[in-house]
Design a protein with these regions (language model features):
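Bacterial N-terminal signal peptides that target proteins for export
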Residues: 1-9
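Surface-exposed, charged secondary-structure patches
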Residues: 102-143
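K/E-rich alpha-helical interaction surfaces of small helical-bundle regulatory domains
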Residues: 82-87, 109, 151-154
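Solvent-exposed, flexible loop/coil residues
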Residues: 70, 75, 112, 120, ...
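Bacterial N-terminal signal peptides
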Residues: 8-18
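Early exported N-terminus immediately downstream of N-terminal targeting peptides
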Residues: 25-104
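Short beta-strand edge/turn micro-motifs at domain boundaries
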Residues: 142-155
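Signal peptide processing junction and immediate N-terminal pro/mature segment
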Residues: 21-23
Length: 155
């Protein structure tokens, strides 16, 4: 559980979620809550699904929730990104997707009464929205999770 918590913190803190289509239809909190609901569903069915099943379950959630192209640009650095070929860009985005899916499938591998709670939604710089949430563990401990959602095409 401790390894799962560390990964959750890193993933939630570092990744940007939301897509332009979702942002137009849902509030930032609703986008985050949909991600959390999917994670809980996967956790509750983790044993029956197995790793491969969890991967198949979470893959469309990851691609819908996370702006992987924007994350790739930020991870590589904008200066480096501009030097990549189209094939290299696609390869990096695919690698980020594979890593995200595998991480969620490996770390959310069971359910012990965990739940997510949205604490606040606040406007941030450049039209972004900051959503603060927490994961409550089965033992009652809480872990803060932070999300930054971008609007429009960057989103």
């Amino acid at each position: 559980m401790q390894r799962r918590i560390l990964i959750v913190i890193l993933v939630a803190f570092c990744l940007i979620i939301g897509s332009a289509a979702q942002a137009a239809e849902k509030s930032a909190s609703e986008v985050v809550n949909a991600l959390h609901a999917s994670l809980l569903e996967m956790m509750k069915d983790a044993d029956a699904l197995g790793f491969d099943g969890r991967s198949k379950f979470i893959e469309p959630v990851v691609t819908k929730s996370f702006n992987l192209p924007l994350i790739a640009v930020m991870a590589a650095g904008e200066k480096n990104w501009k030097t990549f070929s189209k094939a290299q860009k696609k390869q990096l985005i695919a690698a980020l997707e594979d890593l995200s899916v595998a991480t969620y499938a490996a770390r959310f591998d069971g359910y012990s009464g965990e739940n997510f709670r949205t604490l606040s939604e606040q406007p941030a710089d450049q039209g972004t929205t900051y959503v603060s949430t927490e994961l409550t563990q089965g033992d009652g401990g809480t872990i803060p999770l932070k999300y930054l959602l971008y609007p429009g095409d960057s989103g």
